[in-house]
């Protein structure tokens, strides 16, 4: 008979199984369920509220059938194969071949169409048709990538991806009762531990917009965490050196590095900005620290390599407010980190859900003027609880 799987969010749901002649009756009930407010950042109700999920699906069978349907459309693609050999000849290193094909598809094949779980697999488009039309949905673009990579001698696998971050609250009910929640197709390269098909032409090989999301390995039929290649994780790291003077003025040296999706965003920005727009960008950057800030020398943006780098030095006349024997100032760049952990209110009735990673590293080296000592540095240690992980530490080192 048909395999029947079910799962219920444990808190507040009562499950009963009754044998009735030649049938089995299942029932679920929940009582006194409170009305929940619609708060910013609230996770889907099925993650924490009384919910029943029923399925007759099987991920292994789903994966085999989806892989076969996608692979079938990669065959008989002479135009895609010809283009791949032209873009990525055997004289190129294999990573250069991959980058040439990935960049071409990202630049010339416009994303358009429904999500993977919104269309029948019979609607998948052959690789050469997508190549000619210049657009395609996630599955169509994955098929074209697969056909071109195969022609270039690159091993690949198809992976189905969701929009959900991989967390116990999300994966537990999905493992117990399989659901078709897969919205896009990625192309995985085993030899490079990299995923393709969800980033643009300005991304680095190894980064993915599906970072830490729930995926399905079509080969094994198992749920997995989609991870970027080492050093492909999305992150921003900024180091500030602040030379503070007794009159409140300061010189600020900043060095920022961009990885993964932030690299893609900044790389695209600096490639597509006009000189006037670039000037406006740096004016806005300085004004974010102080309206009186002036650049000392020319700021440097280096995004042709990886990671992307941004360097600048500012002279700020009134960086710190002089109040008696005290100098008071705010740390530049800290608002980006504080915005990540704010919950929009002081109290909540529902969990706060962050559906993806966000990594920001800030380092401050502050040179104090003579006879000044740091005070009011905030808590010794602060940490957010489950399911997220975020911590703040302080370390004060006196100059010798």
Regions found by a protein language model. Give the residues of each.
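A sensor for short, sequence-defined functional sites
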Residues: 1-400
């Amino acid at each position: 008979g048909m395999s029947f799987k079910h799962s219920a969010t444990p808190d507040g749901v009562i499950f009963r199984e009754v044998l009735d002649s030649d049938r089995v009756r299942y029932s679920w009930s929940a009582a006194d369920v409170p009305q929940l407010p619609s708060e910013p950042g609230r996770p889907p109700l099925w993650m924490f509220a009384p919910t029943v999920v029923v399925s007759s699906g099987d991920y292994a069978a789903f994966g085999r059938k989806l892989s076969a349907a996608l692979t079938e459309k990669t065959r008989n693609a002479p135009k895609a194969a010809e283009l791949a050999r032209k873009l990525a000849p055997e004289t190129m290193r294999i990573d250069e071949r991959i980058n040439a094909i990935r960049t071409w598809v990202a630049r010339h094949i416009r994303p358009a169409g429904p999500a993977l779980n919104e269309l029948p697999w019979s609607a998948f488009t052959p690789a050469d048709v997508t190549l000619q039309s210049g657009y395609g949905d996630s599955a169509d673009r994955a098929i074209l990538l697969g056909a071109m990579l195969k022609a270039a001698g690159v091993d690949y696998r198809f992976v189905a991806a969701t929009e959900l971050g991989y967390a116990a609250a999300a994966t537990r009910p999905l493992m117990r009762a399989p659901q078709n929640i897969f919205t896009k197709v990625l192309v995985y390269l085993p030899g490079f531990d990299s995923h393709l098909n969800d980033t643009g032409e300005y991304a680095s090989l190894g980064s993915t917009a599906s970072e830490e999301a729930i995926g399905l390995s079509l080969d094994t039929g198992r749920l997995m965490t989609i991870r970027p290649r080492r050093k492909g994780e999305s992150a921003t790291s900024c180091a500030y050196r602040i030379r503070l003077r007794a009159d409140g003025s300061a010189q600020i040296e900043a060095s920022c590095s961009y990885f993964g999706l932030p690299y893609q965003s900044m790389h695209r920005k600096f490639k597509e900005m006009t000189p006037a727009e670039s000037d406006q960008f740096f004016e806005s950057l300085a004004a974010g620290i102080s309206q009186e800030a002036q650049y000392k020398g020319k700021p440097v943006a280096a995004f042709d390599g990886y990671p992307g780098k941004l360097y600048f030095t500012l002279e700020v006349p009134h960086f710190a407010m002089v109040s008696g024997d005290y100098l008071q100032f705010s740390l530049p760049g800290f608002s980006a980190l504080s915005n990540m952990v704010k919950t929009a209110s002081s109290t909540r009735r529902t969990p706060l859900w962050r559906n993806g990673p966000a990594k920001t590293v800030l380092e401050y080296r502050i040179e104090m003027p003579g006879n000044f000592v740091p005070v009011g540095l905030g808590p010794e240690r602060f940490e957010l609880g489950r399911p997220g992980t975020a911590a703040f530490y302080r370390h004060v080192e006196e100059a010798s």
